[in-house]
């Protein structure tokens, strides 16, 4: 056994017989055992763990004299030294060594890539030292939350809010002063809006509120003594207090963050050995003049930003706010967003923003970054989790290298096609001015990056990937699972029914039926989700099962002989914002999905009042219309829907009223679709009127209390 020097004499190659004579020196046997596990799997050896250094040793050492996070790997004179400032980072350093020199890659928590090595190779007199610029790194992914060892391998946290009080992590005002307990007796504790106290936010200049919050924070810390961070933060709405005292401070500070920071500073002063976290989010995002005190953690959120371009280019107001906060404090936690919360499984081409955004945060001294991904399965879930974790650890890594490395190892020969898909869809959105929204819908991209022609191209790439690997191999199964995002986008394209490539129905011999290609796609989507335990469509709890059931119902509707199809619609009330405010949406044959962007006509604070002209007298037996509910976005079912008929569009007769079957409450299903239908018996009419009664305002218990509520309607069916 001997050391083999390369011809250039710049590298040292240690063969397996030589390596087997090494021992491992470490105060931590578990870290040494971990190294042995991967030595055994990569080169087939396990080394003696000892406290005696030999001529050839691997030394795992903790160096506590340096008061900062670091890892280092050194090779000199046949000694391999792996060191870090604490045990956690020593694990990270060991994993770094395993990855760099044993060519191991942890790609998901159920797949590790190995190579069959004959030796390990070092640059001569190798010395590597690295200080991670981000000290707390979190990717919101169940891959890490359910497997703490896998999280350690990728050097991220295994929980979303490390060190936080478990029940007080974000949007906590309502936890400190519950509406049910305080509002009736003390409405002055809450936000004044248009002369009315609403339980949407707290009045931050009320001294009793400050005392109650301090007492609550103290109780939480007593209950959870091992936690050292608690969130004292606004609830998830923009209805902050505008009383004279609060408004005066906000005006002086130049931002509603003024009252927030004054309030949170006052809380933090009472807990000098704890960290009080608060949000710079929506209305509090703009920094005030007052500085947060030392133990206040600012969680700065980028929720408004366009996800198709880097924040520094496409969201300059956020970039400016980030720089403003970084001048006030070094204690910044970034809360960034990397998925479409309304459609987890949809293609979401934010690939070109991941690295630039992390670099922006790091350049502005963010030491804590939380990348809020989907947690649950979403488009190319494993790939995204991997790339974000890698870049949080080392923002200087090359995105394309990471992309290709992962895909080639995780998908085998199919990997190059997955990389081509990622680059292709990113190029498509780069060539448009498309605003990629966190709460958007695939249908918004049907005239750009998700056009029928582009969908066909993506489909071809995934099919090439499938064809390039062995049928039913693990590679094949992974590619098939990853294809569901294209399957989902294609299904939504069929639903929209706007392209010859993806037609919803076909007609033969005057008989309308569903396109058989659609049926095959729907069945494949359902099977892939079922086989891989993919259960959620969005953050509102809308399940894959809900989606399949509603889609099949929509297909039954699509083949009905609808007398209203493509008939003229006159609106007697004014819609707002969605579906281009086009009344034809109600009769266009395209069926609304689970998102309000998906072919729904919206009315904010007012009723739907629509008249359909059938062109001539028609025999009518039944009428129905669908309505959408998304409670967290103040979208509710109508209180009731009334159907009318007329021969002349002047004199109207009511067919009856249909009440909402699912009364709104805090326990209502967040995302749902309800059909309001009525039997007409047998009558003849030319004109049909539908009036859907809006609740007008969100109820007092809702986070949007007193704001105008929405109703969303689609597809009047007249049989």
Predicted feature descriptions by range:
Residues 2-15:
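Bacterial Sec-dependent signal peptides at the C-terminal "C-region" and cleavage site
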Residues 14-17, 26, 30-34, 38, ...:
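Feature activates predominantly on carbohydrate-active enzymes
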Residues 39, 45-71, 82:
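Short, well-ordered secondary-structure micro-motifs within conserved domains or adaptor modules
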Residues 50-52, 392-579, 583:
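Catalytic domains of carbohydrate-active enzymes that cleave complex glycans
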Residues 208-209, 219, 317-416, 420:
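Structured mid-domain segments that build the active-site/substrate or prosthetic-cofactor binding neighborhood
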Residues 250-267, 294-312, 392-398:
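Acidic, His- and aromatic-enriched active-site or binding-groove loops in soluble protein domains
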Residues 277-304, 345-352, 378-385:
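Substrate-binding cleft/loops of secretory-pathway carbohydrate-active enzymes
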Residues 592-656, 672-719:
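Aromatic, loop-rich ligand-recognition surfaces of beta-strand-rich domains
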């Amino acid at each position: 056994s001997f050391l083999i020097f390369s011809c250039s004499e710049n590298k040292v190659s240690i063969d397996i017989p030589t390596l087997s004579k090494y021992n491992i020196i470490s105060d931590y046997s578990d870290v040494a055992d971990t190294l042995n596990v991967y030595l055994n799997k990569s080169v087939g050896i396990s080394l003696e763990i000892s406290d005696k250094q030999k001529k050839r040793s691997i030394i795992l050492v903790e160096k506590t004299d340096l008061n900062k996070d670091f890892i280092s790997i050194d090779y000199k004179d046949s000694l391999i030294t792996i060191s870090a400032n604490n045990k956690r980072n020593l694990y990270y350093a060991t994993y770094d060594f395993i990855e760099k020199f044993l060519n191991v890659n942890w790609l998901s928590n159920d797949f590790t890539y190995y190579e069959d090595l004959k030796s390990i190779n070092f640059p001569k007199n190798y010395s590597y030292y690295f200080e991670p610029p981000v000290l707390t790194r979190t990717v919101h992914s169940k891959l890490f939350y359910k497997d703490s060892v896998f999280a350690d391998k990728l050097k991220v946290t295994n929980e979303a809010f490390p060190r936080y009080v478990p029940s007080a992590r974000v949007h906590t005002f309502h936890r400190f002063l519950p509406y049910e307990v305080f509002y009736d007796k003390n409405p002055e504790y809450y936000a004044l809006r248009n002369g009315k106290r609403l339980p949407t936010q707290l009045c931050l200049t009320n001294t009793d509120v400050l005392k109650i919050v301090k007492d609550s924070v103290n109780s939480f810390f007593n209950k959870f003594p091992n936690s050292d961070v608690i969130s004292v933060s606004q609830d998830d709405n923009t209805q902050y207090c505008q009383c004279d005292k609060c408004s005066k401070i906000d005006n002086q500070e130049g931002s509603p963050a003024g009252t927030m920071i004054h309030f949170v500073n006052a809380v933090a002063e009472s807990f000098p050995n704890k960290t009080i976290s608060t949000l710079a989010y929506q209305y509090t995002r703009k920094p005030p003049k007052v500085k947060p005190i030392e133990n206040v953690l600012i969680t700065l959120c980028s929720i408004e930003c366009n996800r198709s371009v880097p924040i520094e280019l496409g969201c300059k107001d956020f970039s400016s706010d980030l720089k403003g906060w970084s001048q006030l404090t070094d204690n910044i936690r970034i809360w960034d967003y990397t998925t479409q919360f309304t459609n987890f499984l949809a293609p979401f081409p934010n690939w070109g923003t991941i690295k630039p955004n992390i670099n922006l945060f790091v350049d502005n001294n963010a030491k804590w970054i939380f990348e809020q991904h989907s947690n649950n399965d979403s488009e190319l879930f494993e790939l995204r989790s991997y790339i974000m974790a890698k870049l949080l650890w080392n923002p200087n890594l090359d995105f394309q290298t990471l992309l290709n490395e992962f895909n080639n190892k995780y998908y085998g020969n199919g990997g190059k096609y997955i990389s081509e898909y990622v680059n292709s869809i990113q190029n498509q959105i780069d060539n448009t001015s498309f605003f990629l929204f966190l709460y958007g819908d695939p249908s918004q991209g049907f005239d750009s990056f998700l056009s029928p022609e582009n969908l066909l191209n993506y489909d071809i790439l995934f099919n090439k990937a499938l064809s390039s690997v062995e049928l039913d191999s693990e590679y094949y199964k992974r590619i098939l699972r990853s294809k569901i995002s294209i399957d989902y986008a294609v299904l939504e394209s069929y639903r929209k029914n706007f392209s010859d490539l993806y037609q919803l129905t076909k007609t033969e011999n005057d008989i309308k039926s569903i396109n058989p290609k659609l049926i095959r796609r729907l069945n494949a989507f359902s099977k892939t989700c079922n086989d891989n335990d993919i259960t959620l469509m969005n953050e509102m709890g809308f399940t894959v099962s809900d989606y399949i059931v509603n889609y099949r119902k929509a297909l039954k509707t699509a083949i009905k002989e609808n007398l209203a199809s493509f008939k003229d619609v006159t609106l007697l009330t004014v819609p707002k914002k969605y579906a281009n405010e086009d009344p034809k949406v109600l009769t266009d044959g395209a069926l609304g999905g689970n998102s309000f962007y998906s072919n729904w006509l919206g009315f904010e604070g007012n009723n739907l009042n629509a008249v359909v002209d059938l062109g001539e007298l028609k025999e009518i037996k039944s009428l129905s219309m669908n309505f959408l509910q998304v409670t967290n976005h103040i979208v509710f079912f109508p209180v009731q829907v009334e159907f009318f008929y007329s021969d002349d569009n002047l004199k109207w007769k009511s067919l009856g009223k249909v009440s909402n079957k699912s009364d709104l409450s805090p326990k209502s299903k967040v995302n749902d679709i309800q059909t309001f239908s009525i039997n007409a018996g047998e009558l003849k009419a030319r004109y049909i009127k539908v009036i859907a009664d809006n609740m007008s305002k969100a109820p007092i218990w809702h986070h949007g209390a007193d704001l105008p509520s929405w109703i969303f309607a689609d597809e009047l069916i007249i049989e």
